[in-house]
Regions:
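C-terminal recognition in membrane/secretory proteostasis and scaffolding
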Residues: 2-42, 139, 172, 230-232, ...
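Serine-dependent protease modules
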Residues: 26-289, 338, 366-368, 376-381
Length: 382
């Protein structure tokens, strides 16, 4: 039986970052129908100055069969089930979800599980089930939605199996890969096999572009967060079923373990991704209603700046370009930020805006001429 989570971790740090939603180059237009569509990136972290986690080192042994690999690694993969409580019209509703995870480290009796952010996003209750059938209360330690990586911890006095992390940079196209996970949320421990089809695939996942491994290994909903292993029994990828089109056979994706490991280690040590840039702005999206043939086009404008925002931004600015890159969507905005490091000097072009009111409506009008300035990117999460 699942245990209800009675409380969150002892020290919870919630870091909220409002990102932009899309952009347009047109000016002197009235914005109307502003949408409630802010994009927030949240890290939740029981951050205590960096945990000392023990990992398993590799011995580079190549197994002769799939059965031998599965025997060596299957116990490192766990099932994750979640419950999310929502309230609507004074009533509470509980939604259930399921995915997979891989045990990758231990500190004392605390085991560290890597999974996808979308597996546990919004969950009020997390249950982890091992291959042997033991169930544990899971606590969310840290998460990053742009990397789609989350860390869940469990406490166990039993000795649990820990996956060996491989080197995804050394993968060869065509080599055999084995996926183990919980497809459909009810078939835990399912094993499928395929080959590595490609590396370095740039795949859009919602409002971000991720660099992923491509495989023809069968992956279904519930596999998310599970392990992708090579024939050495090394974890070389974290399965991402969210990017895998169920209508297209033989094309599935996973996060390279080298990328996931960097995110994992930074979240453990700092509580955020070291070097990731942000402007710390509260931004919304709206539609242009008039001017220069621009009616119906979408713009991004700043609804609020705060003491921690990057310098020189002003409320109601329409963000037009970042380091010369035109911002036409939230994807463009996040891509531009991903090309910047915290502490970098950045050139930004905006159109200054101001509130415009009439008898019938109110909105925001923008200057006819743009304003260009330089600012220094902030460290995301600080």
């Amino acid at each position: 039986m699942k245990e209800r989570i009675k409380k969150v971790l002892s020290i919870i740090i919630v870091l909220l970052l409002m990102f932009s939603l899309s952009g347009c180059s047109l000016v002197d237009d009235l914005v109307q129908g502003s949408e409630n569509s802010k994009n927030e990136t949240t890290n939740v972290c029981d951050y205590q100055g960096g945990s000392v986690v023990t990992y398993v080192s590799t011995d580079s042994k190549v197994y002769s069969s799939t059965a031998e690999v599965v025997k060596a690694v299957a116990d490192t993969v766990v099932e994750i089930t979640t419950e999310t409580v929502t309230t609507s019209w004074g009533r509470q509703y509980i939604a259930s979800g399921a995915g997979s995870g891989v045990i990758v480290g231990v500190s004392g009796n605390t085991y560290y599980i890597i999974t996808n952010n979308h597996v546990i996003s919004g969950a009020s209750d997390i249950t982890v089930r091992t291959r042997s059938g033991e169930e544990y209360k899971g606590n969310l330690l840290a998460t990053d939605d742009s990397a789609d990586i989350a860390i869940v911890i469990i406490t166990s006095t039993n000795e649990l199996s820990i996956a060996t992390m491989g080197n995804s940079d050394e993968l060869q196209i065509g080599e055999d890969l084995i996926a183990i996970g919980n497809p459909l949320g009810s078939l835990g421990g399912t094993v499928t096999k395929g080959i590595l089809s490609a590396t370095g695939r740039s795949i859009q996942v919602e409002n971000y572009v991720m660099t992923l491994l491509q495989t023809d290994t069968a992956i279904n909903p519930g596999n998310s967060g599970g392990g992708l292993f090579n024939m050495r029994g090394e974890l070389i990828g974290v399965v991402n079923a969210k990017t895998s089109d169920e209508e297209i056979e033989g094309i599935c994706f996973a996060i390279p373990i080298n990328n996931a490991k960097k995110v994992f280690n930074d979240l453990l040590e700092y509580g955020y991704i070291l070097g990731r840039a942000t402007f710390n702005l509260e931004i919304s999206v709206a539609t242009l209603s008039s001017g220069m043939g621009s009616s119906g086009k979408t713009v991004v404008y700043i609804t609020n700046v705060n003491d921690n925002s990057a310098d020189n931004f002003m409320q109601y600015d329409m963000i037009y370009k970042i380091n010369g890159m035109e911002i036409t969507s939230i994807l463009d905005y996040n891509t531009a930020l991903s090309m910047i490091k915290a502490g970098d000097e950045v050139e930004v072009e905006v159109y200054r805006g101001s509130v415009s009111q009439s008898f019938w409506s109110s909105g925001i009008s923008f200057d006819k001429e743009s304003t260009t300035f330089k600012t220094t990117a902030k460290q995301y999460g600080e």
